[in-house]
């Protein structure tokens, strides 16, 4: 099999690429190396085996068309994208060009030149908006959604908020419509929070990794307070990279069953954490005290998002295996090693 990964030097892309190399898959990695850690991930991948690296920009139609026509991949994990809510607000045009324009470039190249190529697209829970139409309770450490105690499924109303939600939502819908109208083999994963090794987190993207960085700093004697947005009771279900690898490659083996569908993806309610609960895990594991100052709530932030994954579980018999506690410890250990 010939596999293309756009954004293949990012966190998720590099994890998927490393597994592909371990399986002897013919791999093409496409990336513009603009994100923090991307060059480091490329060097790491290069130490694992041989693959084709293409330095290009998903916004450039010619780059994408040449990519598809030259390599004619059997399958593609489309991960290239602008991934930060805050960046989308600072620069909505760039956010649109990458997430919508870039996705259309890929879809059109596949439609015109390689229509049998399978595409699995990494979308987001932000397509559901701020979810303020639901009722919430507040405990000492977290918010809980009264109306959706087991999480949100795919029947949840689409409600794009923020430029990021709009751009990812538009790409999400183009993926589904190209399956419906043009018969392409596309699949959409609406992700909650992902974390794991090779995640060079930043303040506005990759919250588990970011706060693991803070824990490492505190453990090393850097005790200045850090900031969080809101009161720390916001909840997400977290999914470790090992489970992401299992998901994507299991899905790839079952594309005929799931093409043209969107799936909510996450660690489920049993692997859900608030910021405060994450801090407690890190404090206990590292024997530290995590002190922070509060900033205002971020625009369009969800108080709770937990994925109900019954649809994908029923379709391909996949579910998470790495617990939040074990995964956070793995994340901390990797962060402290770099």
From Swiss-Prot:
**Matching Pfam families:** GDP_Man_Dehyd
- The positions flagged as active site in the entry are 164
What Gene Ontology molecular function terms does this protein carry?
CDP-abequose epimerase activity
User: Which sites bind substrate?
Assistant: 124
- For this protein, the Enzyme Commission number is 5.1.3.10
User: In its keyword annotation, does this UniProt entry include Isomerase?
Assistant: yes
Gene Ontology biological process terms in this record: lipopolysaccharide biosynthetic process
Q: Does the keyword Isomerase apply?
A: yes
Q: Which cofactor does it need?
A: NAD(+)
Give me the comment on cofactor binding.
Binds 1 NAD(+) per subunit.
Which superkingdom heads the taxonomic lineage of this protein's source? Bacteria
Q: Which pathway does the database say it acts in?
A: Nucleotide-sugar biosynthesis; CDP-3,6-dideoxy-D-mannose biosynthesis; CDP-3,6-dideoxy-D-mannose from CTP and alpha-D-glucose 1-phosphate: step 5/5
Reactions catalysed, semicolon-separated, are: CDP-alpha-D-paratose = CDP-3,6-dideoxy-alpha-D-mannose
For this protein, the parts annotated as crossing the membrane are none
- Main EC class the enzyme belongs to: isomerase
Alphabetical UniProt keywords: Isomerase, Lipopolysaccharide biosynthesis
Report the SUPFAM superfamilies cross-referenced here.
NAD(P)-binding Rossmann-fold domains (SSF51735)
How this chain assembles, per its entry, is: Homotetramer.
Stated role: Catalyzes the isomeration of CDP-paratose to CDP-tyvelose.
Q: Which family does it belong to?
A: Belongs to the NAD(P)-dependent epimerase/dehydratase family.
Q: What is this protein called?
A: CDP-paratose 2-epimerase
> From which organism does this entry originate?
Salmonella typhi
């Amino acid at each position: 099999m010939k596999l293309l990964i756009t954004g293949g030097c990012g966190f998720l892309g590099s994890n998927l690429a490393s597994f592909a190399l371990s399986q002897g898959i013919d791999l093409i990695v496409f990336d513009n190396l603009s994100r923090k850690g991307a060059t480091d991930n490329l060097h790491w991948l290069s130490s694992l085996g041989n693959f084709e690296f293409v330095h290009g920009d998903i916004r450039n139609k010619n780059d994408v068309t040449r990519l598809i026509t030259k390599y004619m991949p059997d399958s593609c994990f489309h991960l290239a994208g602008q991934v930060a809510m805050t960046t989308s607000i600072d620069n909505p045009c760039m956010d649109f060009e990458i997430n919508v324009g870039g996705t259309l470039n890929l879809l059109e190249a596949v439609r015109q030149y390689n229509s049998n190529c399978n595409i699995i697209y990494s979308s987001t829970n932000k397509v559901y908006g701020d979810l303020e139409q639901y009722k919430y309770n507040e405990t000492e450490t977290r918010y809980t959604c009264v109306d959706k105690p087991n999480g949100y499924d795919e029947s949840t109303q689409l409600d794009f908020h923020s430029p990021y939600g709009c751009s990812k939502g538009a790409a999400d819908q183009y993926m589904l419509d190209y399956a419906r109208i043009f018969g392409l083999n596309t699949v959409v994963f609406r992700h909650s929070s992902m974390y794991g090794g090779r995640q060079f987190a930043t303040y506005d993207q990759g919250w588990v990794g970011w706060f693991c960085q803070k824990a490492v700093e505190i453990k090393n004697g850097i005790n200045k307070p850090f900031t969080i947005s809101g009161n720390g009771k916001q909840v997400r279900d977290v999914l470790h990279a090992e489970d992401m690898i299992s998901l994507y490659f299991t899905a790839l083996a079952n594309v005929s069953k799931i093409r043209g569908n969107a799936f909510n993806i996450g660690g489920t309610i049993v692997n859900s954490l608030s910021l405060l609960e994450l801090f407690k895990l890190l404090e206990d594991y590292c024997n530290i005290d995590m002190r922070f100052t509060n900033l205002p709530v971020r625009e369009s932030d969800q108080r709770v998002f937990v994925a109900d994954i019954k649809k994908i579980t029923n379709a391909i018999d996949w579910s998470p295996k790495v617990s939040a506690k074990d995964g956070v410890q793995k994340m901390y250990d990797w962060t402290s090693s770099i």
